């Protein structure tokens, strides 16, 4: 049998509808395989229409520009439910009452529908990557209404500037609640209240600079004892924690807060509380130590008695202008979109684009320009061109990408109720178990020195779940109460099944972008020929199942 890769899911609840299976058309002016690889990196999977359109545009730069210009498909605002679920969903209420108002289910359905059919594919893909860097989780932010503004920030700022994204996320109430910045108070005279350090630590470790000083190519900088040099210490954490004091929920639709702590409001950005005289009475007024500008440099300090807004902007500037941001964030976005193990040269080129704000004709020339950063990642020589055959190139398709790629590429019909599938594979969308994402970005494949972040959730259970998903999608029709379902139609493939080589060539083109190796092709041919030509459906189903469960498909290259 064909090699089975990595994991493949338990999908016991999907109703199957009919749709048309549309093979992708190879491009003429651009390299066909590269167009399809480009769309796998820049969208949730190539479709017949997207492949044709990119081909017609004539260049990857034009394809990128079209996506940069596409209007965002945002999450619709949801009216906040009462804090206590018993008020809205008393005992005896249908289960969907709690599901729709006190879980991330509504946002999950929107996510999958936008990923499957949204015209802003690149924005959707980048926003999800940013969500895995700036993690906010429904494990703590349970109401879907609370999460919507955060999700829309990721979409709106995906093509803007990283400094704006950093500010918008920092002042988002869902983030404020998740990492305890909202209602973070200054030290009181009795010493019983001290500024919370949670957001201060994570904004450095996860959202901007990482733990150790980096060269522009992402490699570590070492001290004279050949040890990595930390980017910050406890004094730095305390300095930022004191900066982030005095912020609370805004009064609805205003930039003011009437009290501290103020009443819950997840719809508007947090504000700095000021008393009737305009004084920020809950902001710490002491001297604050921030980050140094070089590995051996003295830390930047904020003077005492500054206004809280001034401290806040200066602290974000200090973070944003740190030399680590380009390689630290750039590498993570490369890992999400292209390959888990980018070369130092690749990271350096992407880092340069972040620093200069320009790449391949994109960008404003301002540091942190996201369009320049994205263009540098997707148009780089390490992303484009001939198929990359290095053993450590590419990345395991994370569950969301695995499911969505298959459905988009096969032109599936779906209602977007798909989160139960990815959850079984280890990725419960918008419910990351910790602030460190669904899987750690630094995860190495056991027994190797190769980064493989997505393998961090690639357990034996997840592997079985992936296989069960493919098995159910290809061979079964499983009814789900209240769900339209998801399905593909094999009618077109069935017409090819009489000639196994035609069937194999089509699947190679559709799913593997004409890169199927000879060993896999030979094994497929043997297996298909072992099935009677009088049963074209079984031939088609078996071939699709074997291709999608192969290691050649599981790893996006």
Locate the predicted segments by residue.
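Generic alpha-helical secondary-structure signal
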Residues: 38, 63-66, 168, 240, ...
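N-terminal accessory alpha/beta regions
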Residues: 48-157, 182, 255
